Each structure stands twice: as C-alpha cells, then as structure tokens.
From Swiss-Prot:
Keywords: Disease variant, Endoplasmic reticulum, Hereditary spastic paraplegia, Membrane, Mitochondrion, Neurodegeneration, Neuropathy, Phosphoprotein, Transmembrane, Transmembrane helix. Changing residue 20 to E: In SPG31; loss of function mutation; shows severely altered localization to numerous punctate small structures throughout the cytoplasm; does not localize to the endoplasmic reticulum; impairs normal ER targeting. Changing residue 19 to L: In SPG31; impairs normal ER-targeting. It is a multi-pass membrane protein. Expressed in circumvallate papillae and testis. The keyword tRNA processing does not apply. It is linked to Spastic paraplegia 31, autosomal dominant: A form of spastic paraplegia, a neurodegenerative disorder characterized by a slow, gradual, progressive weakness and spasticity of the lower limbs. Rate of progression and the severity of symptoms are quite variable. Initial symptoms may include difficulty with balance, weakness and stiffness in the legs, muscle spasms, and dragging the toes when walking. In some forms of the disorder, bladder symptoms (such as incontinence) may appear, or the weakness and stiffness may spread to other parts of the body. Neuronopathy, distal hereditary motor, autosomal dominant 12: A form of distal hereditary motor neuronopathy, a heterogeneous group of neuromuscular disorders caused by selective degeneration of motor neurons in the anterior horn of the spinal cord, without sensory deficit in the posterior horn. The overall clinical picture consists of a classical distal muscular atrophy syndrome in the legs without clinical sensory loss. The disease starts with weakness and wasting of distal muscles of the anterior tibial and peroneal compartments of the legs. This is Receptor expression-enhancing protein 1. Changing residue 42 to R: In SPG31 and HMNR6; impairs normal ER-targeting. The modification Phosphoserine is found at residue 152. It comes from Homo sapiens (Human). Interacts with SPAST and ATL1; it preferentially interacts with SPAST isoform 1. Interacts (via C-terminus) with microtubules. Interacts with odorant receptor proteins. Interacts with ZFYVE27. One of its GO terms (cellular component) is cytoplasmic microtubule. Belongs to the DP1 family.
Length: 201
C-alpha cells in the first residue's frame, strides 16, 4: 500500500507544481484557451484540497485510500479524460451560477460582521491596555514617592546627627557639685600660703 508520505509527494508535485508551471506558461503566452483550462483545474483542485482535509481524518483507514487520491489527481490532469473540465462544467459551474447571489450575500455579511467584531475587540484591547498602563504608572509613581520620602527622612536625620549645636540651657545639677568639690582645695591652699607668709614676717 502507498504510504501517506508518497501520496503527499505525488499530489504536491503533480497536483500543484506541475499545473502551476503550465499556468505560468498560459499567462505568459496569453492563450485564452489554456488560461480557462487551468483556471477550471485550480477551482476543482481547491475543492479537492478542502475535502481532503476532512477525508484524511475520517477515511484514512479506508483500503487503497491514498491510491485513490493519486488516481483522482491523475484523472484531473490527464488531457485524455479532462477530469477537471468535466467536473467544472457538469457540477461546479451550474451550482455556483444558481447560488451565486446567496454566496455573495453571505460573504458581504461575513465581511461586515468580521469588521465589526474586529473593531469591537480592538476597542476592548485598547481599553485594557490603557487601564493597565495607568495602573502601572500610578504604582510606579507611588513607589517613587515612597523612596523619595524615605531618602529625605534619612538625609534629615543625618544632618541633625552631624551638625547639632550644643545646648544653651543651664548646666545639669551634677556639674555644679563637681566644680564645687574641685574649688575647695584651691581655697585651702591659698589660706595656708597666706598664713605661712605672715609667720615669716
């Protein structure tokens, strides 16, 4: 059985790259017939890719599933079967022609709703961002003011500790007693000196 990798490579090379190159040649040569042919192929291949997304999930267990995918892409590309032109002319074009107005209305409504939703969520996002910015700024300002206040209090206490003047009030009680005690020996010494001088005289 063909594995998923081989199937993916075949679809990528022969279902995408090969038609892309020939689409380039059709645009370059301005061949209307080839241009229409490859446009029909790309429409069918887009539908195939969309369906493949779901069938790979739910039908990958089916026997010969990947072989059928390769055979389908080859059938689309074959100039003998002209599978893409057949599917487009028989099914896709009539369906799109009958449902074109409804599809256009749905696309317009989806576009308007998506624009309104984008504007709504954009406004909400801006409001949330503005609120977060204001809260962050207020918190930062509060922290800065607290730090400045703490710095100013530290500076004030430092100035008081370094340059504080001496107290100008009366001396404490203990200082008078100390001076009196130290003054008594001086007085007794002067009295003894005067007595000795009078005795010698």
């Amino acid at each position: 059985m063909v594995s998923w990798i081989i199937s993916r490579l075949v679809v990528l090379i022969f279902g995408t790259l090969y038609p892309a190159y020939y689409s380039y040649k059709a645009v370059k040569s301005k061949d209307i017939k080839e241009y229409v042919k490859w446009m029909m192929y790309w429409i069918i291949f887009a539908l195939f890719t969309t369906a493949e997304t779901f069938t790979d999930i739910f039908l990958c267990w089916f026997p010969f599933y990947y072989e059928l995918k390769i055979a389908f892409v080859a059938w689309l590309l074959s100039p003998y079967t002209k599978g893409s032109s057949l599917l487009y002319r028989k099914f896709v074009h009539p369906t799109l022609s009958s449902k074109e107005k409804e599809i256009d209305d749905c696309l317009v409504q989806a576009k308007d709703r998506s624009y309104d939703a984008l504007v709504h969520f954009g406004k909400r996002g801006l409001n949330v961002a503005a609120t977060a910015a204001v809260m962050a700024a207020s918190k930062g300002q509060g922290a800065l003011s607290e730090r400045l206040r703490s710095f100013s209090m530290q500076d004030l206490t430092t100035i008081r500790g370094d340059g504080a003047p001496a107290p100008s009030g009366p001396p404490p009680p203990g200082s008078g007693r100390a001076s009196g005690k130290h003054g008594q020996p001086k007085m007794s010494r002067s009295a003894s000196e005067s007595a000795s001088s009078s005795g010698t005289a």
